[in-house]
């Protein structure tokens, strides 16, 4: 089990509440597809794919993770199974996306996005990635 300090919980929940995370994740997806073009392969068959629509799905899952920070693995069990067994997403792609989300958050909050704050977000996303990758093991 991950230990969360009150400062970490506050940073993550306040940022989610006070930031247009759908825009942040849309921009992060667009960045990921541009910088790491092979990640687009999961969406090429979907002619109606738009980053903004998928961003809404991602943000919904992340909001749930924020609400259940102490039990993300249980929360993401079915989502992990879907990504592993049905979608066959390379789990390395999760790292690429979360790195791009952190870049977008840093750009948006440049005056207050310190290395310490980045560390909090790295920790949060490592927990999320571990949970969504659980069924791959």
From Swiss-Prot:
GO MF, one example: heme binding
Keywords: Heme, Iron, Metal-binding, Oxygen transport, Transport
Any one Gene Ontology BP term: hydrogen peroxide catabolic process
One GO term describing the cellular component: blood microparticle
Amino-acid positions noted as binding heme b in the UniProt annotation, renumbered to this chain: 54, 83
UniProt cross-references to Pfam families, sorted A to Z: Globin
Gene3D superfamilies, per database record: Globins
Keyword Nucleotide-binding annotated: no
Domain of life per record: Eukaryota
Domain Globin: 3-137
Expression sites (tissue/organ): Red blood cells.
Family according to the record: Belongs to the globin family.
Oligomeric and partner information: Heterotetramer of two alpha chains and two beta chains.
Function: Involved in oxygen transport from gills to the various peripheral tissues.
This protein's name: Hemoglobin subunit beta
Species assigned in the record: Mustelus griseus
Name of the gene encoding the protein in the UniProt record: HBB
């Amino acid at each position: 089990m991950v230990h969360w300090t009150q400062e970490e919980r506050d940073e993550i929940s306040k940022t989610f509440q006070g930031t247009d995370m759908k825009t942040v994740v849309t921009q992060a997806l667009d960045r990921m597809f541009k910088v790491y073009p092979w990640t687009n392969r999961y969406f090429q068959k979907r002619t109606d794919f738009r980053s903004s629509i998928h961003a809404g799905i991602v943000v919904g899952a992340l909001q749930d993770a924020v609400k259940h920070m102490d039990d993300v693995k249980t929360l993401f069990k079915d989502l992990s199974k879907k990504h592993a067994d049905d979608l066959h997403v390379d789990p390395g792609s999760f790292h690429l996306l979360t790195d791009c989300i952190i870049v977008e958050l840093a750009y948006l909050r440049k005056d207050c996005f310190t290395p310490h704050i980045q560390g909090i977000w790295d920790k949060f996303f490592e927990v999320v990635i571990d949970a969504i990758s659980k069924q791959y093991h």
